[in-house]
Amino acid sequence: MKKVKAQKKSPAVDYRESLIEELKGDEKAQYAYLKASLEENSDMPEVFLKAVETVAKARGFSNFAKKTGLNRENLYRIFSNERTPRLESLVKILDALGFKLTITPKAS
């Protein structure tokens, strides 16, 4: 019988998994992470969506998916950057996580 080598995870995967673990059960940290992601990457919405996905996984993705009212295929497309979410979808996603979309003036 041939031995199969265990595949090493990439550092990015290890980091993301440890971040998910760190964010579990800490809503203040989840909020700070999302806020920083959006503020520091305002010109790259895909980074914010990846942060939202990370928080959703920290809270339990299956339960999160049910709360959004969106089907899993739609969520997969949004989080894999296959499709830009409609505003309505983004509002549902944030609402399922206990957040809301707000607008503030840019700092000069």
Briefly describe each language-model feature range.
Residues 1-50:
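N-terminal flexible/basic segments that precede or flank functional cores
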Residues 24, 38, 57, 80-83:
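Alpha-solenoid HEAT/Armadillo repeat architecture
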Residues 48, 61, 103-105:
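Recognition helices and adjacent regulatory flanks at domain boundaries
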Residues 57-77:
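Short alpha-helical DNA-recognition segment
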Residues 87-104:
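DNA major-groove recognition helix of helix-turn-helix/homeodomain DNA-binding modules
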